[in-house]
C-alpha cells in the first residue's frame, strides 16, 4: 500500500489482468475508480506506474496465485478480500495507520520532496476542482509520474533500511 498509495478498494480488488508487469504498469479500470456511478462508464483507466520494487513483489505474489485477484478472499478465490482485511492486517502488525492514511503520507512527503502538485494529484486520481482547467487539460504526466513513483519507492526503502 505505501508504494502505490491507491484507494483501499482499488488495491484489494485489483485483478491480475490489470497489470503489465513487463512494462511496470497497472491500469485500474475507470469503473473501479471513485466517483459517481453514472460517470464511471466513460471514465478512462487510471495509470499507476510500478516501481521496480513493486514489480518484484508482484512477480513473487503472482507465482503462488491461483486466482484472478491479487488478494483473493481466504475461502473464495473468485472474490477479493473484504474491506476490513487490510486494516486488520495493519493492526496485527501493530502498525498504527489507516489504509487511507498512506495516501496522506505519500501526498505530504511528495510535496515536501518538491514534486509538483499536479503530478501528485494526477497520481492520486484526484479530479481538478477547476472545471474549466479540467475540461481542457487532459495531461497524464506519465513520464513525470514514473520518475516520481520510483523516487518514492526508493525513499521508502531507505527509511526501512535506516
Residue ranges and their predicted role:
Residues 1-25, 117-122:
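Short, charged phosphate-coordinating catalytic segments
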Residues 30-36, 55, 113, 124-159:
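Catalytic-site neighborhood detector that most strongly recognizes the C-terminal catalytic loop/helix
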Residues 16, 30, 67-68, 96-99, ...:
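Generic secondary-structure boundary/loop-capping signal
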Residues 23, 49-97, 101, 105-106, ...:
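Active-site/catalytic core of tyrosine-dependent DNA strand-transfer enzymes
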Residues 1, 12, 59, 87, ...:
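Generic hydrophobic alpha-helical scaffold/packing signal
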Residues 6-7, 46, 103:
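Short, cationic motifs built from Arg/Lys/His that form the positively charged side of catalytic pockets
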Residues 13-60, 128-134:
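Conserved tyrosine-mediated DNA breakage-rejoining catalytic core shared by Y-recombinases
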Amino acid at each position: 500500500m505505501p508504494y502505490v498509495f491507491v484507494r483501499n478498494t482499488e488495491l484489494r480488488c485489483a485483478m491480475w489482468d490489470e497489470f503489465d508487469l513487463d512494462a511496470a504498469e497497472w491500469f485500474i479500470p475507470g469503473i473501479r475508480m471513485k466517483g459517481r456511478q453514472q460517470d464511471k462508464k466513460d471514465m478512462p483507466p487510471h495509470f499507476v506506474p510500478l516501481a521496480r520494487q513493486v514489480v518484484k513483489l508482484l512477480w513473487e505474489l503472482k507465482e503462488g496465485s491461483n486466482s484472478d485477484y491479487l488478494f483473493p478472499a481466504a475461502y473464495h478465490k473468485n472474490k477479493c478480500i473484504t474491506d476490513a482485511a487490510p486494516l486488520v492486517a495493519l493492526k496485527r502488525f501493530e502498525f498504527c495507520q489507516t489504509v487511507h492514511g498512506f495516501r496522506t503520507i505519500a501526498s505530504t512527503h511528495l510535496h515536501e520532496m518538491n514534486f509538483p502538485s499536479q503530478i501528485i494529484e494526477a497520481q492520486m486520481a484526484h479530479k481538478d476542482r477547476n472545471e474549466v482547467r479540467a475540461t481542457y487539460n487532459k495531461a497524464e504526466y506519465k513520464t513525470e509520474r514514473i520518475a516520481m513513483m520510483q523516487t518514492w519507492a526508493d525513499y521508502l526503502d531507505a527509511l526501512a533500511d535506516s
